[in-house]
Amino acid sequence: MSLELLSQLETKIQTALETIELLKLELDEEKEKAANLAEQNHQLKQELSSWNDKITGLVGLLSNQVD
């Protein structure tokens, strides 16, 4: 191989490595976002469950008052 071809190959490899590193960073960011969203989803589900329990209790109280 000529030096020019080796130089071109080296440049392409370096570009590929840089692209891989950037993609790894993006993947890590997306994983962190996903984890945060999963935690937020869990908290919202707990809040919804709590509100459902409160509403069920209030409906029960209203039912008792009507009877």
UniProtKB/Swiss-Prot annotation:
InterPro entries: Cell_div_ZapB. Its main location: cytoplasm. The keyword Lipid metabolism does not apply. GO terms for cellular component: cytoplasm. Residues 3-59 form a coiled coil. Non-essential, abundant cell division factor that is required for proper Z-ring formation. It is recruited early to the divisome by direct interaction with FtsZ, stimulating Z-ring assembly and thereby promoting cell division earlier in the cell cycle. Its recruitment to the Z-ring requires functional FtsA or ZipA. HAMAP family: ZapB. Homodimer. The ends of the coiled-coil dimer bind to each other, forming polymers. Interacts with FtsZ. This is Cell division protein ZapB. It comes from Shewanella amazonensis (strain ATCC BAA-1098 / SB2B). The gene is zapB.
